[in-house]
From Swiss-Prot:
Family: Belongs to the class-I aminoacyl-tRNA synthetase family.
Enzyme class: ligase
Catalyses which reaction(s): tRNA(Leu) + L-leucine + ATP = L-leucyl-tRNA(Leu) + AMP + diphosphate
One Gene Ontology CC term in the entry: cytosol
Protein name (record): Leucine--tRNA ligase
Positions annotated to bind ATP: K622
Cross-referenced Pfam families: Anticodon_1, tRNA-synt_1, tRNA-synt_1_2, tRNA-synt_1g
Biological source species: Haemophilus influenzae (strain ATCC 51907 / DSM 11121 / KW20 / Rd)
GO MF annotations, alphabetized: aminoacyl-tRNA deacylase activity; ATP binding; leucine-tRNA ligase activity
Motif ('HIGH' region): 42-52
InterPro entries, A to Z: aa-tRNA-synth_I_CS, aa-tRNA-synth_Ia, Leu-tRNA-ligase, Leu_tRNA-synth_edit, M/V/L/I-tRNA-synth_anticd-bd, Methionyl/Leucyl_tRNA_Synth, Rossmann-like_a/b/a_fold, tRNAsynth_Ia_anticodon-bd
């Protein structure tokens, strides 16, 4: 081996070896335990960012470790290649989305290979390829035949000038991103999959996932939102109409003072027929697209319809209001309002001077002030006829029973979860495989017509989808009669909901999945990705697995046994304010820093000498220009250094602060490992380790080696605390660099230690370890080496080193048996030559013994 550590020379050579020998190719082998490790695949945006690097490094460390344990490891890779950004980039760069996407894939693949990830590239998937989405289209038609797919009208963002649908990201402050025309809300027919049919299974399945983060499971439980309540039907006075509401608080039923309905509710349209003011308000409310998350904080607005509902128990007439906080797609599109016991209803009632009637009192009889806020806790009923004095449970059941007997109510389990709308009025997606016949009937495209191929050689004008703009694309036939293809494309969450399963058989042509391969590899043993996917991708991922199970493709209940959600990568962000008062963000790589003695930034300047404002550590982003290019870092420091820093700087689930000083520290550490192996190699051990001939110092060093092996094995395997595993190896390295190499047994102990260090670091820094493994005299590549095992016997301490002090000053060290009592320790210590000269001819006043550690002798003349 050469004397200097040169990652620029080592890494390309090792990567070439891996590629040529297909080291990471996974083949089904029933004789071996499988291990499927998967990191969420990326959108091919053009360049890797540090978030990608962190995600894939974690997955690669786990994969390499599991391979060393003797498991048959699958670690595939692919591209979530459809999506809106490609359309924007195509318009900007005057190219086709497909061309832009494929160029990005090629570039990012090279970047990934520079980092040395052990992917099985023979299983690579790009979701924009027809051979992938063909089976997605086929599966959709099968779900349609099973009654799990339907079409209904739904609200979209509509630009009246361009006559096109806009994604939420294309609406800027209520206007079209392209022409600045005010955006309207429009109802159009869209396709839905009945995820609500699986709500109970999705909820119950969370209890079978002990190795998923609790936060993710809680977020999914809340998103599914199971509630038990009562659906109540009110008659509308002086009409034949009825209005239904759903409530989880029937105990408050006697306190209802008005009903709120959504702007899109049929009753609202009825009331607006002869009321132009109400019609205008309804239109305004419809156009003001409201996210559920904003309901609590938005200004509550409403208008009376002039209609009244009849309270089924009291006979009271309750005014019906159109309210902007009631959403048509949530529940029944109508709510019973109890201002005394719901804060939102309270704010609305106060604004419009509606009655506030108390029907719940605190259990402890304390005073409440219903002029300031609603009392929302459970309590005992008041002003509620025969139910006065009952608690929540008693009132819930009593009032529900009464409503059911009267035929105006029924107990019901509801879910917050809505069916999955999969239609997108975009071009760059998989075409939805449905056909419209001349008579208006809609039928699924037959298998022989699949895939319905998305044309890739198109021109984007930024207005209409090319398949919508082309009058001929949609034309087709069905049973020899003219038909039209659907011009909507799938939500890209469709592709990412089943890719993990297709990786098990990416070249399989006879069906969606090869059940034999799928059931060998699935479920995924370790899935890795950001927690931001908790309620979208990770829910659809679980849903699709249950659909695949019910279609007979898989036998497992859940798609992944274990989930790790890695933290974000942060970097310093700097800016200056321009003459037009705009913040100009400067890349941290262009900033010169001054720090105080504690390392805090006290001054930052850009290359022009401008003083910059340091806005702190924030998530790497284009908007703040604080992204660090992984490729630049690999070229500067080497892939192993970048990987080591990524795994060491923070626990995997926590945010990671990018500090170049930390990267430099990682490079220095690898240099020390290299130097120690080089130093050992100059005079290596010529005989094997003789455990019977070890000195006390050699036993202590060997004990440290095996204690480190035990800790690192537990940290990487069970605990997945990779940073503490690395810290343990660093601590061991400090001891090894101070160890003697003088005797043959010294060198034999060192040989064992270095073999262990190289194997422990291999999952994290594989290139340098590949080279060092060979330098240590191993003939086969480290990629086939077994994980190092701790020797239990070596960790047993049969002797202790006791520090001996005389009058508080260290005068010697003695070795005693671990179970030696105080008298034995004193006898050995007093006989030690170094100690004797300080206690001979002295009067021993007292002896203090700290068991197993220290003996202090207090003397005087």
């Amino acid at each position: 081996m050469q004397e200097q550590y040169r990652p620029d020379m080592i890494e390309p050579k090792v990567q070439q070896y891996w590629a040529e020998n297909k080291v990471f190719k996974a083949i089904k082998d029933e004789s071996k335990e499988k291990y499927y490790c998967l990191s969420m695949f990326p959108y091919p945006s053009g360049r890797l960012h540090m978030g990608h690097v962190r995600n894939y490094t974690i997955g690669d460390v786990i994969s390499r470790y599991q391979r060393m344990l003797g498991k048959n490891v699958l670690q595939p890779f692919g591209w979530d290649a459809f999506g809106l950004p490609a359309e924007g980039a195509a318009i900007k760069n005057k190219t086709a989305p497909a061309k832009w996407t494929y160029e990005n894939i090629a570039y990012m693949k090279k970047q990934l290979q520079l980092l040395g990830f052990g992917f099985d590239w023979d299983r690579e998937i790009a979701t924009c390829k027809p051979e992938y989405y063909k089976w997605e289209q086929w599966f959709f038609t099968e779900l349609y035949k099973k009654g799990l797919v339907y079409k209904k009208t739904s609200t979209v963002n509509w630009c009246p000038n361009d006559e096109t649908v806009l994604a939420n990201e294309q609406v800027h402050e209520g206007c079209c991103w392209r022409c600045d025309t005010p955006v309207e809300q429009k109802e159009i027919p869209q396709w839905f999959i009945k995820i609500t049919d699986y709500a109970e299974q999705l909820l119950g399945g969370l209890d079978t996932l002990p190795q998923w983060p609790d936060m993710v499971k809680t977020m999914q439980r809340n998103w599914i939102g199971r509630s038990e309540g009562v659906e109540i039907t009110f008659d509308v006075a002086n009409t034949n109409e009825k209005v239904a509401v759903y409530t989880t608080r029937p105990d408050t039923f006697y306190g209802v003072s008005y009903l709120g309905i959504a702007a899109a509710h049929p009753l609202a349209s009825l009331a607006a027929q002869n009321n132009s003011e109400l019609a205008a308000f309804i239109q305004e409310a419809k156009n003001a697209k409201v996210a559920e998350a904003d309901l609590a904080t938005m200004e509550k607005k409403g208008m009376a319809t002039g209609l009244f509902a009849i309270h089924p128990l009291t006979g009271d007439k309750l005014p019906i209001w159109v309210a902007n906080f009631v959403l048509m797609h949530y529940g029944t599109g109508a709510v019973m309002a109890v201002p005394a016991h719901d804060q939102r209803d309270f704010e609305f009632a106060q604004k419009y001077s509606l009655p506030i009637k108390q029907v719940i009192a605190p259990l402890a009889d304390e005073e409440i002030d219903l002029t300031k806020q609603a009392f929302v806790e459970h309590g005992k009923l008041v002003n509620s006829d025969e139910f006065d004095g009952k608690n929540f449970d008693g009132a819930f059941n009593g009032i529900a029973d009464k409503l059911e007997k009267l035929g105006v109510g029924k107990r019901q389990v509801n879910y917050r979860l809505r069916d999955w709308g999969v239609s997108r009025q975009r071009y760059w997606g998989a075409p939805i495989p449905m056909l419209t016949l001349e008579n208006g009937d809609v039928v699924p495209a037959p298998m022989e017509d699949l895939p319905i191929i998305l044309p890739e050689d198109v021109v984007m004008d930024g207005v209409k989808s090319p398949i919508n703009a082309d009058p001929n694309w949609a034309k087709t036939t069905f049973n020899d009669a003219p038909a039209l293809k659907e011009t909507d494309t799938f939500d890209t969450f469709m592709e990412s909901s089943w890719y993990y399963a297709r990786y098990t058989c990416p070249q399989y042509q006879n069906g969606m999945l090869d059940a034999e391969e799928a059931n060998y590899w699935l479920p995924v043993d370790q899935y890795i990705g950001g927690i931001e996917h908790a309620t979208m991708h990770l829910l659809y991922f679980r849903f699709f697995h249950k659909l695949l199970r019910d279609a007979g493709f898989v036998t497992s209940e859940e798609p992944a046994d274990k989930l790790l959600c890695q933290g974000m990568v942060l970097a310093d962000a700097f800016y200056y304010t321009s003459p037009t008062n705009e913040r100009i963000w400067v890349s941290p790589t262009q900033v010169t820093l001054e720090r105080d003695e504690k390392g805090r930034i006290i001054k930052a300047t850009d290359p022009e000498g401008r003083e910059l404002v340091h806005s702190g550590m924030t998530k790497m982003s284009k908007s703040k220009n604080n992204g660090i290019d992984p490729q630049e870092m690999v070229e500067k420091y080497g892939a192993d250094t970048v990987r080591l820093f990524m795994m060491f700087a923070s626990p995997a689930e926590m945010t990671l602060e990018w500090q170049e000083s930390g990267v430099e520290g990682a490079k220095r550490f690898l240099g020390r490992v290299w130097n120690l192996v080089y130093q050992y190699q100059q005079n290596p051990a010529k005989t094997s380790l003789d455990l019977t001939a070890l000195s006390a110092e050699q036993k202590v060093l060997r004990r440290e080696v095996h204690k480190t092996i035990a800790k690192v094995s537990d940290d990487i395997g069970r605990r997945q605390t990779f940073n503490t595993a690395i810290a343990a190896v660093m601590e061991l390295m400090n001891k090894l660099t101070k160890a003697s190499l003088d005797s043959e047994q010294d060198r034999a102990v060192m040989a064992e230690a270095l073999s262990a260090v190289v194997r422990m670091l291999y999952p994290i820094t594989p290139h340098i370890c590949f080279e060092l493994w060979q330098a240590l005299g191993n003939e086969s590549a480290i990629d086939t080496a077994e994980w190092v095992k701790a020797d239990e016997a070596a960790m047993v301490e049969d002797e202790k080193l006791i520090v001996v002090q005389v009058n508080g000053k260290v005068r010697g060290k003695v070795t005693v048996a671990t179970d030696a009592d105080e008298d034995t320790v004193k006898t050995i210590a007093f006989a030690d030559e170094n100690v004797k000269k300080f206690i001979d001819n002295q009067h021993i006043v007292k002896v203090i013994y700290v068991v197993g550690k220290l003996l202090n002798v207090v003397v005087k003349p």
